Amino acid sequence: MQGSVTEFLKPRLVDIEQVSSTHAKVTLEPLERGFGHTLGNALRRILLSSMPGCAVTEVEIDGVLHEYSTKEGVQEDILEILLNLKGLAVRVQGKDEVVLTLNKSGIGPVTAADITHDGDVEIVKPQHVICHLTDENASISMRIKVQRGRGYVPASARIHSEEDERPIGRLLVDACYSPVERIAYNVEAARVEQRTDLDKLVIEMETNGTIDPEEAIRRAATILAEQLEAFVDLRDVRQPEVKEEKPEFDPILLRPVDDLELTVRSANCLKAEAIHYIGDLVQRTEVELLKTPNLGKKSLTEIKDVLASRGLSLGMRLENWPPASIADE
């Protein structure tokens, strides 16, 4: 019962009529006038375009190079086979993509039940016909890629991005990921006590069997609620940008002097002066290095050339050297 004239009614009756395992009617009432169409249209659009699911995206058929061809001993042409594969209802657990195989020979229909798959894959409608073999010696072998996605993605959207690496004979298929095949809603009159201007929303939908209709409605409502959360609190809810911290020093400065691959004489002279890292070395001047016992002009020239090849030089000034990671060693 409504508490005040400004308080909105909330639906108090939900009736779910399960016509079949893939077909159901969901009734929601009472709704304020106009809310039947508001909610019905929003849920319908989400159910048709935004529900996640699995679909066939690529097919390879032995002996077939392109979709505008036929295969000997097969009643259907390749385009019709691809169209039949689009209707394959597959449920995949724990993976974003799987590759299924199909091998069949001899006269008769080729159905989804002939597909070989592992335990993570369930073929919901094994009786679904893919093609017909018309000769005893006829056979067909194919590899079918099934991917997880959302909504509808035409093959043309993937052609340009995959053209360079797509081998000849790999056929792209328009992917309809949504498990909802048909949905319609109707708004009828509802009554609560003396109010007769209320709405009753009736949603009728059919799925491909990979999801229960009731669960589909629940997921669509969850998606809608999550999208509307930002409007509940209109303050800036953007996530703070995580700034990538730049290293205090060039990583090459933290490497040991041994990485410069100096001659044994030059390397030993530097170690005797406690110059262990490249960062230690570049802060020394030519005059300072020439004062090092046994380090002459030839060794100095070698050191300068090696540093120059790495974009470094002697006499550099490094603030806050050494870093904590080196100082603690």
Swiss-Prot record:
Entry keyword annotation includes DNA repair: no
Keyword annotations from UniProtKB, A to Z: DNA-directed RNA polymerase, Nucleotidyltransferase, Transcription, Transferase
EC identifiers of the protein: 2.7.7.6
EC category name: transferase
Known catalytic reactions: RNA(n) + a ribonucleoside 5'-triphosphate = RNA(n+1) + diphosphate
GO terms for MF: DNA binding; DNA-directed RNA polymerase activity; protein dimerization activity
Annotated GO CC locations: cytoplasm; DNA-directed RNA polymerase complex
One GO process term, biological-process aspect: DNA-templated transcription
Region annotated Alpha N-terminal domain (alpha-NTD), chain positions: 1-235
Region (Alpha C-terminal domain (alpha-CTD)): 249-329
Transport keyword on record: no
Domain of life of the native organism: Bacteria
Gene3D superfamilies membership: 5' to 3' exonuclease, C-terminal subdomain, DNA-directed RNA polymerase, insert domain, RNA polymerase, RBP11-like subunit
HAMAP family given in the database record: RNApol_bact_RpoA
Subunit structure: Homodimer. The RNAP catalytic core consists of 2 alpha, 1 beta, 1 beta' and 1 omega subunit. When a sigma factor is associated with the core the holoenzyme is formed, which can initiate transcription.
Family, per entry: Belongs to the RNA polymerase alpha chain family.
Free-text note regarding domains: The N-terminal domain is essential for RNAP assembly and basal transcription, whereas the C-terminal domain is involved in interaction with transcriptional regulators and with upstream promoter elements.
Functional note: DNA-dependent RNA polymerase catalyzes the transcription of DNA into RNA using the four ribonucleoside triphosphates as substrates.
Name assigned to this protein: DNA-directed RNA polymerase subunit alpha
Gene name as annotated: rpoA
